Amino acid sequence: MRRRRRRDGFYLAPDFRHREAEDMAGVFDIDLDQPEDAGSEDELEEGGQLNESMDHGGVGPYELGMEHCEKFEISETSVNRGPEKIRPECFELLRVLGKGGYGKVFQVRKVTGANTGKIFAMKVLKKAMIVRNAKDTAHTKAERNILEEVKHPFIVDLIYAFQTGGKLYLILEYLSGGELFMQLEREGIFMEDTACFYLAEISMALGHLHQKGIIYRDLKPENIMLNHQGHVKLTDFGLCKESIHDGTVTHTFCGTIEYMAPEILMRSGHNRAVDWWSLGALMYDMLTGAPPFTGENRKKTIDKILKCKLNLPPYLTQEARDLLKKLLKRNAASRLGAGPGDAGEVQAHPFFRHINWEELLARKVEPPFKPLLQSEEDVSQFDSKFTRQTPVDSPDDSTLSESANQVFLGFTYVAPSVLESVKEKFSFEPKIRSPRRFIGSPRTPVSPVKFSPGDFWGRGASASTANPQTPVEYPMETSGIEQMDVTVSGEASAPLPIRQPNSGPYKKQAFPMISKRPEHLRMNL
């Protein structure tokens, strides 16, 4: 699992924050504007009535007898009934889900306050490692901000974000289905109807990001997770680009080489159309066992992406071949999805003719694979290399300078859904106490290096290979980029292995399973 400037502390949605202030003011109203000559409580008859109107629209007299009063102990818990302060101690570490150079991902259980007992994924990042260079700082900035802004059925949910002196914590929904990558490793290749389901859900997630002015730029099997039902969830938003709308381009060189669009490699400026190229590369990977263009090293892979013809296996249906050719066009302007219709253009293709988009968005379409899970805490779909380890969050003994810590101001976040549950649980509905008023691969990741420190925390058919025929070559649409002279390096590196189809009966067995691709590239924190 990879993945606004405001005062640090608990974030309250504006409507809740104001309402809570009014509620608390009502609870502790002591009527300081009462006239000095008003009668004291001693002058009232025992068990008598208060005969003045209470400004409740003519509400009548209130009985002051003890039978109408509620006794409660004054304590921090009973007085401070708003959202709790989230800190590492609020979570019990259960398993290690992944590790990276900058931190770990744990499976955790919340043990205090709202969501007590619920399972989450906790991503822990070391501040000292992040602030070393602008690239990693920008990665963290983008992920944190986008996760707060974007809410969609096919995008991972951020529940909490908080920090200590030396670490950043992102509490995400736990996706017990694991990575789509592991499903591909298990199956080798997908049937077309299976690929169609996943591609359809992914296209809806990409379309939602594009509506928000966000380009994803790192679509690959490792960044696609499955929930407990088998539905898709996009994760890892570190390479996203924000505020990109129609007519706007960006020039940052980033992504994972095998899935990168030619215009990114050419540094000629790119827009949201790069995500549709990546969807085509992912579709090719699902249906054939490897991305469309791979080489012995990065330079050879780039050379193939820019110049080579697209080879399509003969077993693909006409609809699949046509969609691949339209998504993998080197001329970005003529690529399917590049027009004003964006995701709608892709979804209207005959390859998706059997998809009911409304039911898909509502997650009423049954996924082709449902994880076989024993409990909510099941980690069988994750690599046992990590899950076997003892979960330990190392002591937070590092200290950053005050200027370095300024970078992380406003990092704290609480999901609106949590605030809503707090509002429901701690509603300030008045009980009659007294007459007072009461008033939410070798994959090759390339990260962006440009960073501005200002405004940091802003806002079918079977895929059988029984008939081995020579793949058919289809000439790809040419453009100026194919004339580029790419120097091929003599550096040696292992080629991307091609998955072989699993010809045996499908077994819904739990992992562990050893990936055929280098482990150090499977977890990017």
UniProtKB/Swiss-Prot annotation:
Residues 424-525 are annotated as: Autoinhibitory domain. Keywords: Acetylation, Apoptosis, ATP-binding, Cell cycle, Cytoplasm, Kinase, Membrane, Mitochondrion, Mitochondrion outer membrane, Nucleotide-binding, Phosphoprotein, Serine/threonine-protein kinase, Synapse, Synaptosome, Transferase, Translation regulation. Residues 32-54, 380-399 are annotated as: Disordered. Residues 381-399 have a biased composition (Polar residues). The active site is at residue 218. GO terms for biological process: apoptotic process; behavioral fear response; cellular response to dexamethasone stimulus; cellular response to growth factor stimulus; cellular response to insulin stimulus; cellular response to nutrient; cellular response to type II interferon; G1/S transition of mitotic cell cycle. GO terms for molecular function: ATP binding; protein kinase activity; protein serine kinase activity; protein serine/threonine kinase activity; protein serine/threonine/tyrosine kinase activity. Interacts with PPP1R9A/neurabin-1. Interacts with RPTOR. Interacts with IRS1. Interacts with EIF3B and EIF3C. Interacts with TRAF4. Interacts with POLDIP3. Interacts (via N-terminus) with IER5. The autoinhibitory domain is believed to block phosphorylation within the AGC-kinase C-terminal domain and the activation loop. Belongs to the protein kinase superfamily. AGC Ser/Thr protein kinase family. S6 kinase subfamily. This is Ribosomal protein S6 kinase beta-1. It comes from Mus musculus (Mouse). The lineage of its organism: Eukaryota, Metazoa, Chordata, Craniata, Vertebrata.
